[in-house]
């Protein structure tokens, strides 16, 4: 695939400074780029690379003023990082466009409806009564249970398992190894010390423009739905339990765990290895730092929380400053105790 710089500038709403007829066929980091590739400069600390890069073109901010001569063409845009993301999306779409049709062997159940321009990879299984939209790509060895609905422009990568009755919106991406709709962790303790399995009869509903990383598990609801709203971005290796609700445009980093029946607000940021207990609510625009433990409802919007149990950022920093001084404080206390004992001894004599 080749694109001229003029074509790329038109896509980005930018302006070419250099040879607009030059062609690029690959994308690379600025420090590793070769002739025929395009890169970008967004972070000023990488500016030195633009003077030595072999890239045929670099996307830069409109007000960029080079301090040295350049051997590469420039594409001037408002936001280089966002523009480069647009390039990556276009490149990926062009690659995916080559995947079309139904590979054998694969299985499609009774009364399944599959839209146009689809791709179904080898050994994929699509259950009965599924409704699959247009431009959907289902890669090899994916499993789609009965009565599943999948919206347009959605990609299901190899080895994904989607249990029966789940619903996926438009432009959803689910990476390899994900399990959507498995049983929630529901067991009733019995008088004899054993546990009785509670049937999980709900489903998972995933909105539009949701991305889910590899090996993440989203459990079905006990009753009703576990819901992932529009725009949510979920990293690899995350556990989302039964009846959880995650609000629009929330992002969750790897190895986080959210316990059952918890509701996460909109535009939250949940960092890696965060643990959240069940049956609580997290307010909109909450930021939770890595490895924090949330054990209570967070009602106030916009807080940043750290530590386990998590507390507000300023309180955590104050507490941590004291924590770091504990060895010194202990030594001072011991010295004061010794002085006190000595003074007591003098008074007694």
From Swiss-Prot:
The active site is at 242 (proton acceptor). InterPro entries: Hexapep, Hexapep_transf_CS, LpxD, Trimer_LpxA-like_sf, UDP_GlcNAc_AcTrfase_non-rep. The keyword Disulfide bond does not apply. It catalyses: a UDP-3-O-[(3R)-3-hydroxyacyl]-alpha-D-glucosamine + a (3R)-hydroxyacyl-[ACP] = a UDP-2-N,3-O-bis[(3R)-3-hydroxyacyl]-alpha-D-glucosamine + holo-[ACP] + H(+). Keywords: Acyltransferase, Lipid A biosynthesis, Lipid biosynthesis, Lipid metabolism, Repeat, Transferase. GO terms for biological process: lipid A biosynthetic process. Pathway: Bacterial outer membrane biogenesis; LPS lipid A biosynthesis. Its EC number is 2.3.1.191. It is an enzyme of class 2 (transferase). GO terms for cellular component: membrane. One of its GO terms (molecular function) is N-acyltransferase activity. Homotrimer. Belongs to the transferase hexapeptide repeat family. LpxD subfamily. Catalyzes the N-acylation of UDP-3-O-acylglucosamine using 3-hydroxyacyl-ACP as the acyl donor. Is involved in the biosynthesis of lipid A, a phosphorylated glycolipid that anchors the lipopolysaccharide to the outer membrane of the cell. This is UDP-3-O-acylglucosamine N-acyltransferase. It comes from Cytophaga hutchinsonii (strain ATCC 33406 / DSM 1761 / CIP 103989 / NBRC 15051 / NCIMB 9469 / D465).
């Amino acid at each position: 695939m080749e694109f001229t710089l003029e074509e790329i500038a038109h896509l980005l709403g930018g302006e070419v400074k250099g040879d607009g007829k030059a062609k690029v066929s690959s994308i690379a980091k600025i420090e590793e780029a070769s002739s025929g590739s395009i890169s970008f400069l967004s972070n000023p600390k990488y500016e030195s690379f633009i003077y030595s890069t072999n890239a045929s073109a670099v996307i830069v901010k409109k007000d960029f003023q080079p301090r040295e001569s350049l051997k590469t063409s420039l594409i001037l845009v408002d936001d280089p990082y966002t523009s480069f993301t647009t390039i990556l999306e276009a490149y990926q779409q062009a690659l995916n466009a080559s995947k079309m049709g139904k590979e054998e062997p694969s299985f499609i159940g009774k009364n399944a409806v599959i839209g146009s321009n689809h791709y179904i990879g080898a050994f994929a299984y699509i259950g009965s009564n599924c409704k699959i939209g247009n431009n959907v790509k289902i890669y090899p060895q994916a499993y789609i249970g009965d009565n599943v609905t999948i919206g347009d422009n959605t990609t299901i990568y190899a080895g994904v398992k989607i249990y029966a009755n789940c619903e996926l919106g438009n432009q959803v991406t689910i990476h390899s190894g994900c399990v959507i709709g498995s049983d929630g962790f529901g067991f009733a303790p019995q008088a004899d010390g054993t546990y009785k399995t509670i049937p999980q009869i709900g489903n998972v509903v995933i909105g539009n423009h949701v991305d889910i990383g590899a090996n993440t598990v989203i459990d079905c609801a006990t009753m009703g739905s576990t819901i992932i709203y529009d725009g949510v971005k979920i990293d690899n290796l995350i556990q989302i339990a039964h009846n959880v609700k995650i609000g629009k445009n929330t992002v969750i980093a790897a190895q986080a765990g959210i316990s059952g029946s918890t509701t996460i607000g909109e535009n939250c940021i949940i960092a890696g290895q965060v643990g959240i207990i069940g049956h609580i609510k997290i307010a909109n625009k909450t930021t939770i730092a890595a490895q924090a433990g949330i054990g209570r409802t967070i009602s106030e919007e916009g807080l940043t929380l750290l530590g386990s149990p998590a507390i507000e950022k300023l309180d955590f920093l104050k507490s941590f400053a004291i924590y770091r001084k504990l060895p010194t404080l202990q030594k001072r206390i011991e010295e004061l105790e010794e002085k006190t004992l000595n003074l007591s001894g003098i008074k007694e004599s």
